[in-house]
Amino acid sequence: MVTSNVVLVSGEGERFTVDKKIAERSLLLKNYLNDMHDSNLQNNSDSESDSDSETNHKSKDNNNGDDDDEDDDEIVMPVPNVRSSVLQKVIEWAEHHRDSNFPDEDDDDSRKSAPVDSWDREFLKVDQEMLYEIILAANYLNIKPLLDAGCKVVAEMIRGRSPEEIRRTFNIVNDFTPEEEAAIRRENEWAEDR
């Protein structure tokens, strides 16, 4: 069975139908799909004569008009930790990067030194809450390039700023006493004004 679509279900229960290639931008979803494929191969070899029987896949009634030889069954994948608006943004990112090649995820040096793509930089110009949720979703879904881009954008928001400016930017309450803050500044003088 060839599955061309995957239905992602957000935390609120909203369904997003995406092409399998888009879903596979997520290592979590790619592994899930591979496991489903392996499970189906095992099930099919166990019951070869039941090829037309019901499977673990859920089928949608609307068929985009594609009458290819491919089966239009869809795998439903819940994504309970991701809100609909965030999942929609992650899908938008994955669609844009459908055919993109990224540095090897095991090569930390090339990933860390690669600048943020200009499209990604524009894409991540969202309010802070959305940016954080995109980063959390990228982490949960194991989408390293999106996670890296989001973290680099946050790092750029911090770079060159004083602790007070960082607190204002990120709405962080200063819970240090003046004495504690002075001690921390003394301990970290070496990192100031390079």
Curated annotation (Swiss-Prot):
One of its GO terms (biological process) is regulation of mitotic cell cycle. Belongs to the SKP1 family. The keyword Phosphoprotein applies. Pfam families: Skp1 (PF01466), Skp1_POZ (PF03931). Residues 54-63 have a biased composition (Basic and acidic residues). Disulfide bonds: none annotated. This is Suppressor of kinetochore protein 1. Signal peptide: none annotated. The modification Phosphothreonine is found at residue 177. Residues 64-75 have a biased composition (Acidic residues). GO terms for molecular function: cullin family protein binding; DNA replication origin binding. Keywords: Centromere, Chromosome, Cytoplasm, DNA-binding, Kinetochore, Nucleus, Phosphoprotein, Ubl conjugation pathway. It comes from Saccharomyces cerevisiae (strain ATCC 204508 / S288c) (Baker's yeast). Essential component of the E3 ubiquitin ligase complex SCF (SKP1-CUL1-F-box protein) ubiquitin ligase complex, which mediates the ubiquitination and subsequent proteasomal degradation of target proteins like phosphorylated SIC1. Participates in the attachment of chromosomes to the spindle. Acts as a regulatory component of the centromere DNA-binding protein complex CBF3, which is essential for chromosome segregation and movement of centromeres along microtubules. CBF3 is required for the recruitment of other kinetochore complexes to CEN DNA. Component of the E3 ubiquitin ligase complexes SCF with HRT1, some cullins like CDC53, and some F-box proteins like MET30 CDC4 and SAF1. Interacts with CDC53 and MET30 to form the E3 ubiquitin ligase complex SCF(Met30) which also contains MET4. Forms complex SCF(Cdc4) together with CDC4 and CDC53. Component of the CBF3 complex, which is formed of CBF3A/CBF2, CBF3B/CEP3, CBF3C/CTF13 and CBF3D. Component of the RAVE complex composed of RAV1, RAV2 and SKP1/CBF3D. Interacts with RCY1, ROY1, CBF3D and SGT1. Gene3D superfamilies: Potassium Channel Kv1.1, Chain A. Pathway: Protein modification; protein ubiquitination. Residues 135-194 are annotated as: Interaction with the F-box domain of F-box proteins. Residues 38-79 are annotated as: Disordered. Its main location: cytoplasm.
